[in-house]
């Protein structure tokens, strides 16, 4: 993410904190002096303090939810969670998961779900709890679809 905000941050400042597009809305609201609207961006947090070189607000994870077929990189409906260096992918069609340590495997080439079953179960539980908390819609079955 590249930010130009004259007089508000040091030129050339680089930060390696993960952010997600849902953070843009509360960030822009705060940048222009408007109040944030948490009901409109329940997962987004303002990045203004981060942009200005301060501490980032801690969050319990970054979540993705794609309950449909798309070209977003996932081949089938699924969800994902990132917490620290760990990322878990859940595939809704067959109930499988993949687990990656992004610090050691940024390209997500080595699935650790069988080697780290406790971590996979913890993240899967956290992902499913988040879906319930935000009322995430799941894809309804299509009775007309045939394999």
Which ranges hold each PLM region?
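Hydrophobic packing residues in well-ordered alpha-helices of helical domains and bundles
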Residues: 81, 120-123
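Short glycine- and hydrophobic/aromatic-rich loop-to-beta-strand nucleating segment
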Residues: 1-3
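C-terminal cap/loop subdomain of S1 sulfatases and analogous C-terminal strand-loop tails that border
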Residues: 8-10, 17, 22-102, 133-139, ...
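Charge-dense polyanion-binding interfaces
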Residues: 122-140
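Intrinsically disordered, low-complexity polar regions and short flexible loop motifs
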Residues: 105
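Active-site-proximal N-terminal segment of extracellular/periplasmic enzymes that hydrolyze or transfer
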Residues: 110-118
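Generic structural marker for isolated residues within well-ordered, non-membrane alpha-helices
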Residues: 25, 109, 127
């Amino acid at each position: 993410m590249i930010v130009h905000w004259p007089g508000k941050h040091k030129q050339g400042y680089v930060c390696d904190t993960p952010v997600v597009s849902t953070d843009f809305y509360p960030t822009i609201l705060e940048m222009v002096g408007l109040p944030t609207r948490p009901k409109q961006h329940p997962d987004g947090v303002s990045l203004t303090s981060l942009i200005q070189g301060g501490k980032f607000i801690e969050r319990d994870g970054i979540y993705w939810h794609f309950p449909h077929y798309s070209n977003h990189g996932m081949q089938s409906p699924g969800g994902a969670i990132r917490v620290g260096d760990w990322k878990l992918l859940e595939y809704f069609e067959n109930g499988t998961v993949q687990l990656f340590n992004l610090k050691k495997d940024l390209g997500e080439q080595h699935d650790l779900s069988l080697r780290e079953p406790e971590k996979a179960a913890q993240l899967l539980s956290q992902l499913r709890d988040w879906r319930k908390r935000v009322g995430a819609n799941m894809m309804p079955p299509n009775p007309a679809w045939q394999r």
